[in-house]
C-alpha cells in the first residue's frame, strides 16, 4: 500500500454493493492509519429519519464508516429526492449537475483528509447532464478505480464491458470485488474464477451474503458491524 490511498469505486450496475464495499474500504483504510473519508458526487433518493431530518442511506453509511458525527461535514454536493437516474431527477428538480462543483467539493474534502474513497452513482457510464457522464468525472479525478461486481446472472458480461470502459478512459483498475447478492447465484465460484481469468487487475476478495442479523432494513444505512464483516473478506489494493 502506497502512502496515497485514494480510490474511485464503481460497479457493474446499481444495487450491486458499491456502498457496502466503499464503507468496508474506508473502515480498512482507517484501521491502517489513514485519515479516510467517503464522498459521493451525487445521490438520488432520500427519506426522513426519526427526527424528521432528510437522509440518504448511502451517505449515512459513508459517514458511519468515516467515523463522523451526523451533519458534521457534507459528503455530497448534490442530494436528489427520488431514487432514479440522477440526470433525470436533476432535470425534474431543476438542478444542473455540474462536474466542476463536484470536483470542487472533492478537493475541499481532500484538504481535510489524506485519503478519499469516492463512490460513484449506478454504473460507470451513468449520465450526469446533457454532455457529461460519471466516466468523465472519474477521468477528471484520476483516482485508481475499484470495480464492484454484483454476482448474478449476466455479471461476467457486465464486468468485462465495464473494465473496457474504464480502461478506455486511461484509468487504472486497482482491483475488483465480487459481492454476493442476497440470493447466491448458481456456479458462484466458477463465475468468480472466470472473472479472475479475464479481468487483468487484482482480485481483492469475495464478500458472502450478509448474515441476516447484519442485513440493513429499507431506508437505513449499513451498520458498522456489517461494514466490519465485509472488510474481513476483502484486501486493500497494493
For each feature predicted by the language model, list its residue ranges.
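Inter-motif core of Ras-like GTPase G domains
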Residues: 129-152
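Hydrophobic anchor at the beta1->P-loop junction of P-loop NTPases
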Residues: 9
Amino acid at each position: 500500500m502506497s502512502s496515497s490511498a485514494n480510490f474511485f469505486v464503481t460497479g457493474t450496475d446499481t444495487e450491486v454493493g458499491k456502498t457496502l464495499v466503499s464503507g468496508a474500504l474506508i473502515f480498512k483504510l482507517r484501521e491502517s492509519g489513514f485519515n479516510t473519508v467517503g464522498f459521493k458526487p451525487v445521490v438520488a433518493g432520500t427519506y426522513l429519519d426519526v427526527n424528521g431530518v432528510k437522509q440518504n442511506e448511502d451517505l449515512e453509511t459513508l459517514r458511519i464508516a468515516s467515523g463522523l458525527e451526523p451533519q458534521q461535514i457534507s459528503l455530497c454536493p448534490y442530494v436528489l429526492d427520488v431514487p432514479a437516474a440522477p440526470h433525470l431527477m436533476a432535470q425534474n428538480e431543476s438542478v444542473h449537475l455540474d462536474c466542476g462543483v463536484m470536483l470542487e467539493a472533492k478537493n475541499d474534502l481532500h484538504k481535510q483528509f489524506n485519503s478519499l474513497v469516492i463512490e460513484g452513482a449506478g454504473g460507470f457510464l451513468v449520465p450526469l447532464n446533457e454532455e457529461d457522464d460519471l466516466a468523465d468525472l472519474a477521468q477528471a479525478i484520476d483516482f485508481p478505480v475499484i470495480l464492484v461486481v454484483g454476482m448474478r446472472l449476466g455479471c461476467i458480461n457486465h464486468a468485462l464491458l465495464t473494465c473496457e470502459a474504464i480502461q478506455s478512459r486511461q484509468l487504472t483498475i486497482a482491483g475488483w470485488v465480487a459481492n454476493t447478492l442476497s440470493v447466491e447465484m448458481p456456479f458462484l465460484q466458477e463465475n468468480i474464477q472466470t472473472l479472475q481469468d479475464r479481468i487483468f487487475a487484482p482480485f481483492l476478495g469475495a464478500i458472502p451474503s450478509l448474515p441476516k442479523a447484519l442485513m440493513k432494513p429499507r431506508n437505513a444505512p449499513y451498520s458498522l458491524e456489517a461494514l466490519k464483516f465485509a472488510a474481513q473478506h476483502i484486501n486493500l489494493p497494493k
